[in-house]
Amino acid sequence: MFLIKKISIDKIYLLGILLLGLISGFTFNLIFFTVPYQLSEARYTTDIIGLISLAAFPYCLKVVWSPFIDKYSIPFLCSKFGARRGWAIASQLCLILAMTGFLSFSPCDNIYITATILFIISFCAATQDIVLDAYRIERPTSKKELSLAFTFGSIGFRLGMLLGSVGALYISVIFDWSTVYKLAICITFLGPMIVLCIKEPKPKQKSHRTKDLINLKQYFEVIKSSIISLKNEQQHLLLIMLFVFLYKAADSIPMAMSSPLLLDLSFTTHEIAFIYKAYGLFIMIVGGALGGILSTKIGILRSVLTGGIIQLLSPLMFMILAIVGYNVKIFIITITTQNFCIGFAGTIISIYFANLCNSEFIATQYSIIASFSSVSRIVLAALGGICAKYLPWSLFFFCNTLFSMLFILVFFKVYGKKI
């Protein structure tokens, strides 16, 4: 009721953000789940499927081309619809064209063509996400509204993930895989229509855009200006980066190591698919909604601290599951805890990232912070894998909990006087 009430008071654009988030989440799972699953059905080996996932690398490198989105104006589209909406429409139209590649071609037919199409889809989808992130920061007119914008975007993204995984599987069983890709194109086609229905945001600072392609000097100048502006606004920038790294530990390590643990404990594929994927995503949506609401009630800093502390329950529950062994009830409690924490803390940390950005180059700033967060997730997952090889599961997740608690020390070092 709280969210519905907020929409009704001249905030209808939040519904647009939710729907655009749904498209983004659906595309994300198309790349990371749907196509790999179809390849698994076709008996492709795990090493091939693993290499295919590299086609999604543009998601980790958004910062590389975000300066172009901040500085360059696409002829006609940006002058007609505004900078953010123009870029959004361009990226969505390119995304639709890329997806049509799977209409006359099955991903199982040629692995090299599949990788190429997925890479193009990833690039277009990542570009769309850069623009939407900037829109969610620039469009709101208050801190509370900013929290709502990221909450609605997060809920939409999770719904899209649910539709792109469980929904895609059901459609493939009832019809076929080609119908799944037709549905994907239809859903993505809604993107430009939604963008046309929402207003162009007012930049937080004066923007100096150009219709000429920026040169290498201008490109690095945008990145340099973004970092300098970020450093000027945030005196303890290095400590903030360390805080983000430690904050992700309670989320990234259990997420990366949960599948090996569950298989070691002899949970079935059906149990993992239904409880971990379908039910887990639903709980994630609930957690994300509550996280967004909390940030509007008690402020972003207190919400970040609360989310981080609650997040510590995730590795603790996996430790208990490792001690107990195969137990469906404990498994459900563990997955409920983990996914609630991911949704709850994930939404709050996204709002926190948005609050750090305040310059002419918002898309670049947010991409820098989000890219660091993504790299942190990858590094933590890799370190977790190495440690898990030498430690029993219960001790591993206990150490994970202790390590994750270090974020509290860094948080109070940076924000102790502001709480």
From Swiss-Prot:
One GO MF annotation is: transmembrane transporter activity
The keyword tRNA processing is annotated on this UniProt entry: no
| Chain segments annotated as transmembrane | 12-32, 48-68, 86-106, 111-131, 155-175, 178-198, 237-257, 274-294, 304-324, 330-350, 368-388, 392-412
- PROSITE patterns registered for this protein in UniProt: MFS
The record's subcellular location field reads:
Cell inner membrane
Keyword Lipoprotein in the entry? The reply is no
The cysteines covalently paired via disulfide bonds are none
GO CC, one annotated term: plasma membrane
> Pfam families recorded for this chain?
MFS_1
Q: What is this protein called?
A: Putative transporter AmpG 3
Q: Keywords in UniProt for this one?
A: Cell inner membrane, Cell membrane, Membrane, Transmembrane, Transmembrane helix, Transport
Q: PANTHER family annotated for this entry?
A: MAJOR FACILITATOR SUPERFAMILY DOMAIN-CONTAINING PROTEIN 3 (PTHR12778:SF10), SOLUTE CARRIER FAMILY 33 ACETYL-COA TRANSPORTER -RELATED (PTHR12778)
Q: Which family does it belong to?
A: Belongs to the major facilitator superfamily.
* Topology in membrane: Multi-pass membrane protein
